[in-house]
C-alpha cells in the first residue's frame, strides 16, 4: 500500500508543478476566494486526521482511507485546474472526425439525445448518476478498510487516466456533441468556459466555478471502469448494484455529458 501510495503522491507533485507552469505560461490565475480557502481547509483537515490516526493504535484503521481521500482530492483539483491551460493551447477541433466515427458505428447522437429528453425518468436517472461521480469516488476510498492495496491501485490508475485524458485533450481537442450539433434550447456552461478559455477571454478561475471541459476523451466513461474495479472487492450486495451503476455512468456520458460516443468509448476503455 505505502509504496504505491508514495508513487501516487509523487505523481500528484509532478502534476502540481506542471499546473503551475501551465497557468504561468497561459496567464491564467486562480482566484483566492472562499472556495479555494474552504477546499484547502478541508484537505488539510483530512491530512491532519490521517497523521493523527497513524500515531494512535485505536485509530490506525482510519489512516489509509483518509490518505486515499486526501490523494483523490489533490489529484482531482489539480487536474481540474490543468485542463484550462491545456485548452488554451487551442489546437484544431476534431468534432467532425468524432461525429464521422459515430456515424460509422450507426450511432445517431441527436436521436439519442432527443429520446432521452422525451423520457424524463431516464433523463433524471442518467443525470443523477452522471453527477454522482465525485461522491462515488469518495466512497470508494473507504473501501481501503477492506483492501488497502486495491484502493491504492485504483487511485494510481485514476491519476494516470486523468493524465492520459489531459494529454489526448491537448493533442486532439473537441468541443463535444453539444458544440457540434447545437441542439435547440440547450445551454451548456462547460461549453461557454471551453470557448472562453480557447479565445483567451477567460483568465481568472474560481474553484467553485470550474467545470469539466474535456470532451474527448470522456473521463466519466474511463472512471466507470475504474470504479467498477474499486467496488468489485466489496460484498456482493454492494458490488453488483455498483457494477450496474457504473454501466449507466458510462452510458450517461453521451446524452448527459455531451460526449461523442464512438471515439470516446474505445479510447476510454484503452485508457482505463
Feature annotation, model-predicted:
Residues 2-42, 62-139:
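N-terminal transmembrane-helix/juxtamembrane module of multi-pass inner/ER membrane proteins
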Residues 15-24, 76, 162-170, 244-255:
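Aromatic-anchored segments of alpha-helical transmembrane domains
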Residues 28-31, 121, 210, 252-261:
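Membrane-interface helix caps and helix-loop-helix hairpins in membrane proteins
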Residues 40-55:
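Central hydrophobic cores of alpha-helical transmembrane segments in multi-pass inner-membrane proteins
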Residues 63-72, 138-173, 177-184, 239:
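Interfacial segments of alpha-helical transmembrane regions
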Residues 139-146, 221-239, 269-272:
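Membrane-interfacial alpha-helical segments at the cytosolic side of multi-pass membrane proteins
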Residues 167-234:
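Membrane-interfacial catalytic/cofactor-binding modules of polytopic membrane enzymes
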Residues 176, 215, 247-271:
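Interfacial helix-loop-helix junctions of multi-pass membrane proteins
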Amino acid at each position: 500500500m505505502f509504496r504505491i501510495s508514495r508513487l501516487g503522491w509523487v505523481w500528484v507533485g509532478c502534476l502540481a508543478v506542471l499546473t503551475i507552469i501551465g497557468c504561468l505560461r497561459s496567464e491564467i490565475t486562480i482566484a483566492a476566494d472562499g472556495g479555494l480557502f474552504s477546499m484547502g481547509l478541508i484537505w488539510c483537515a483530512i491530512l491532519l486526521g490521517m497523521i493523527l490516526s497513524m500515531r494512535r493504535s485505536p485509530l490506525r484503521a482510519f489512516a489509509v482511507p483518509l490518505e486515499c481521500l486526501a490523494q483523490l482530492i489533490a489529484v482531482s483539483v489539480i487536474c481540474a485546474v490543468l485542463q484550462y491551460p491545456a485548452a488554451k493551447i487551442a489546437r484544431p477541433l476534431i468534432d467532425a472526425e468524432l461525429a464521422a466515427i459515430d456515424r460509422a458505428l450507426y450511432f445517431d447522437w441527436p436521436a439519442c439525445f432527443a429520446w432521452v429528453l422525451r423520457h424524463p425518468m431516464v433523463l433524471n436517472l442518467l443525470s443523477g448518476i452522471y453527477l454522482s461521480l465525485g461522491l462515488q469516488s469518495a466512497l470508494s476510498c473507504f473501501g481501503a478498510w477492506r483492501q488497502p492495496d486495491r484502493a491504492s491501485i485504483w487511485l494510481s490508475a485514476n491519476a494516470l487516466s486523468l493524465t492520459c485524458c489531459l494529454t489526448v485533450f491537448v493533442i486532439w481537442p473537441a468541443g463535444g456533441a453539444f458544440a457540434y450539433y447545437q441542439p435547440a434550447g440547450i445551454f451548456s456552461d462547460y461549453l461557454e468556459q471551453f470557448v472562453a478559455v480557447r479565445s483567451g477571454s477567460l483568465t481568472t478561475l474560481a474553484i467553485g466555478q470550474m467545470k469539466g471541459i474535456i470532451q474527448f476523451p470522456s473521463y466519466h466513461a474511463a472512471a466507470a471502469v475504474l470504479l467498477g474495479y474499486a467496488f468489485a472487492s466489496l460484498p456482493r450486495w454492494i458490488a453488483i448494484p455498483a457494477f450496474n451503476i457504473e454501466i449507466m455512468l458510462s452510458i450517461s456520458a453521451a446524452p448527459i455529458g455531451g460526449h461523442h460516443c464512438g471515439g470516446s468509448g474505445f479510447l476510454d476503455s484503452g485508457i482505463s
